[in-house]
């Protein structure tokens, strides 16, 4: 596992190199604006990286405080995801059993003519794949958020702003997804898209199966696929905004530093 403090150490070295390059460009006896303009930029970039190194631990503590203010925890979020995964696996097993029994039981075979269980199985499989992927991504964000931010600072420290956009993307994604992902259940609840208790109650007869398909399948699609996907896209948008803020706009940095 990468050590975030080692990454910050390397970023500090690169920041020092960037500063000395800027100072050297200032001292060049070449009155060419295209060259001289890099001197203040490099010096401000190096100071900006030093600021990020200084507030690194404070940023991590601030993220924890944001989670507390939102009233969410990663443990609760993972518990919710595992419960969703259990529901999807139960639904998959139920539909798979019905499809298997259709070859031997005429009543079940007739039921399949009414209810398109093949399409239902495809929907459940898609939801199962999405939830499994979301769990894997969430674990990566939870375990490596410190590394993401430190890697972003390292890219910010590369001279001549070569890695500025990449560094901003690492920092923005780490911050937004670490705070935003655990809020997914609350987001779905706010728009009444949480999985209903009916999803966890398998039907007992043919008429119940038809009713289950008519009323519950839309809930499967909205609560297990559409809702989470919309929320992920919202987080992506926020992370892009934070990335732009961190890396600056055009030739400007978000930190106001005057270098003469």
Curated annotation (Swiss-Prot):
Keyword Transport attached: yes
Protein name per its UniProtKB record: DNA import protein CedA
UniProt subunit comment: Forms a complex composed of CedA, CedA1 and CedA2.
Keyword entries, A-Z: Cell membrane, Membrane, Transmembrane, Transmembrane helix, Transport
Membrane topology: Multi-pass membrane protein
Subcellular location: Cell membrane
Chain's gene name: cedA
Superkingdom of the organism of origin: Archaea
